[in-house]
Amino acid sequence: MADSLIQSPDLGDVTGYLRDRIRTVPDWPMPGVQFRDITPLLQNPKTLRVLIDVFVHRYMDAQLDLVAGIDARGFILGAIVAYELNLGFVPIRKKGKLPFQTVAEEYELEYGSATVEIHADACKPGDRVLLIDDLIATGGTMMAGRKLLERLGATVVEGAAIVDLPELGGSKLLQNAGLPLFTVCRFDGH
C-alpha cells in the first residue's frame, strides 16, 4: 500500500494520452521482444510536460528528501522530477561510471547478471527517497537500486516508472518485497 502522503492523480485520459505516444519497436533488441520506446514522450514538449506533471502531482506532498534515478532513462525523468519538486537527485549508475567511493549491488538478468552503484555519500540515514526508472520489466534493477539506498540508511518511499510490463513479473516481485509501486501505464506482452 502506498504512503498516505502520496496523492494519486486521476490519470484517466492522461494514461491513454501517454500510452498512445509510446512507440513499440518489434523484434528489438532481439526477435520476439516488443521494445517500448519512451523517446516520443521526451521529444514533444507538451507530452513531456504532461508526463512530468503526473509524477510531480503524485509526489508534491510526500515529504521526500531526494529522487534517485536508475541509469539511463531514469536519469532523465528523475532529474526533471527532482527539479520540479525542489529536491536533490541521486544517480544510480552502471558499474564503473561513478568517480568517487561507491556501494555496489549485483542483480540477475534473463541472460546473466549486472551491477549498479551509488556514491557512498549519496544520501543520509532517514532520507525519504523516490526511486524512478522508465520501465519495470523483471524488477531486478529497481530492486538493486532499493537495496543500495537502504544500505545507506534511506527509506525508499515508492518505486515509480512510466511503463509496467506485468507479464515479466517485475511489478509483482517488487510489491511482494514490500516496495510500493506506481506506474503510469502498462503493456501486456514483452
Swiss-Prot record:
Its main location: cytoplasm. Belongs to the purine/pyrimidine phosphoribosyltransferase family. The keyword Chloroplast does not apply. It catalyses: AMP + diphosphate = 5-phospho-alpha-D-ribose 1-diphosphate + adenine. Keywords: Cytoplasm, Glycosyltransferase, Purine salvage, Transferase. The keyword Glycosyltransferase applies. This is Adenine phosphoribosyltransferase. GO terms for cellular component: cytoplasm. The lineage of its organism: Bacteria, Pseudomonadati, Pseudomonadota, Betaproteobacteria, Burkholderiales. GO terms for molecular function: adenine binding; adenine phosphoribosyltransferase activity; AMP binding. Gene3D superfamilies: 3.40.50.2020. It holds the Pfam family Pribosyltran. GO terms for biological process: adenine salvage; AMP salvage; purine ribonucleoside salvage. It comes from Cupriavidus pinatubonensis (strain JMP 134 / LMG 1197) (Cupriavidus necator (strain JMP 134)). InterPro entries: Ade_phspho_trans, PRibTrfase_dom, PRTase-like, UPRTase/APRTase. Homodimer. The gene is apt. Catalyzes a salvage reaction resulting in the formation of AMP, that is energically less costly than de novo synthesis. Coiled coil: none annotated. It is found in: Cytoplasm. NCBIfam families: apt, PRK02304.1-3, PRK02304.1-5. Its EC number is 2.4.2.7. PROSITE patterns: PUR_PYR_PR_TRANSFER (PS00103). Pathway: Purine metabolism; AMP biosynthesis via salvage pathway; AMP from adenine: step 1/1.
